[in-house]
Structures are given as structure tokens and as C-alpha cells.
Regions:
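Conserved substrate/cofactor phosphate-moiety recognition/catalytic segment
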Residues: 2-46
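Active-site catalytic pocket residues across diverse enzymes, especially alpha/beta-hydrolases
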Residues: 8, 77-78, 104
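Structural signal for short hydrophobic segments within the conserved structured cores
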Residues: 11-13, 85, 128-132
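Conserved nucleotide-binding/hydrolysis micro-motifs of P-loop NTPases
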Residues: 18-19, 65-67, 91-95, 137
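Glycine-rich phosphate-binding loop used to anchor ATP phosphates in small-molecule kinases
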Residues: 36-82
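Short, amphipathic alpha-helical "lid/cap" segments that border enzyme active or binding sites
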Residues: 42-46, 138-149
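Conserved phosphate-donor/acceptor-positioning beta-strand/loop module used by diverse small-molecule
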Residues: 80-99, 132
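Small-molecule kinase domains that catalyze NTP-dependent phosphoryl transfer to phosphate-bearing small molecules
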Residues: 102-144
Length: 154
């Protein structure tokens, strides 16, 4: 996502940085978040997107948005979704597990990955996701996302 934002020259926001302290503490303790826990975080993500739109400025933000209901909460109505692209990074759990094992300094332990995949509802055609092969290196993922975005804007 950072490589995509850099390639586009757009501001980047790491969605995990918007988690309330209670969520960070819970995940750091190895406890999966509930839908209720995620609510304030999803609202912060939505507010960031809304602020960019209101300012007429683009941006890239990361968010696991594991369920359709979460994505609907973030993206809002059809009118609110105009100009917003949902890029879905698709990879098997084993690939993500290997990446998490190498990640340092993040509050979410790799042990929570299984609960995230159990919760995951991959976006369907009605959500018009731009699906990127996340088994690739980051630069290749960014290039694929750029190509998909260009095709949409085409």
C-alpha cells in the first residue's frame, strides 16, 4: 500500500494506526477483536476517507475490512463509494503467515491470523474489488494495483 501511494504521489494512512488503544492492547494480548471492538476503528477509517473526499484530495489507506458489513460501514452509500476503489490483496493463509512471522514491531501477534481468516468474507463481484495477487513482492503488487486502477479510470 505504501508503494502504491508513493507511485501515485498520494498520502498514505496505515489503518492499524487508527485503532483505539483498547483494541491495540487486546490484540497485543493475543485476543481477537469482536465486531463491537472494531466499530470505533472502522468509523475512524471512514472518517479519514470522508475527509480526503471533502478536501477533494486522493489517498491510500489500509484496512483489513474482513467482512462485507465492515466494508459497507466504511464505504457507506453508493454515492459515497464513487471515486473509492477497494483493492483486495488475495493470498493463501500460509503466505500471510510467513510474512507475519518476519514482521517486527507490530502489536498483532501472528497467532491471531487464523481468527482473521476464519472471519474473512472475500469481496464478491457486487463490491467491484480490484483483486491483486498478494503472493508477489510488494513492488509487483503495487504495479498490479496501479494497472487495475488505470483500467478503472481508463
Amino acid at each position: 500500500a505504501q508503494a502504491l501511494a508513493a507511485a501515485l504521489g498520494w498520502p498514505f494512512q496505515e489503518g492499524d494506526a487508527l485503532h483505539p488503544p483498547e483494541n491495540v492492547a487486546k490484540m497485543a494480548a493475543g485476543v481477537a477483536l469482536s465486531d463491537d471492538d472494531r466499530g470505533p476503528w472502522l468509523d475512524r477509517i471512514k472518517a479519514w476517507i470522508a475527509a480526503r473526499r471533502e478536501a477533494g484530495e486522493p489517498g491510500v489507506i489500509t484496512c483489513s475490512a474482513l467482512k462485507r458489513a465492515y466494508r459497507d460501514r466504511i464505504l457507506g452509500s453508493a454515492a459515497e463509494r464513487l471515486g473509492v476503489a477497494l483493492v483486495f490483496l488475495a493470498a493463501p493463509e500460509a503466505v500471510i503467515a510467513a510474512r507475519l512471522a518476519r514482521r517486527r514491531g507490530h502489536f498483532m501477534p501472528p497467532t491471531l491470523l487464523a481468527s482473521q481468516f476464519a472471519t474473512l468474507e472475500a469481496p464478491g463481484p457486487a463490491e467491484h474489488p480490484l483483486v491483486v495477487d498478494a503472493t508477489q513482492p510488494p513492488a509487483a503488487m503495487a504495479a498490479e494495483a496501479l494497472a487495475l486502477l488505470a483500467a478503472v479510470d481508463g
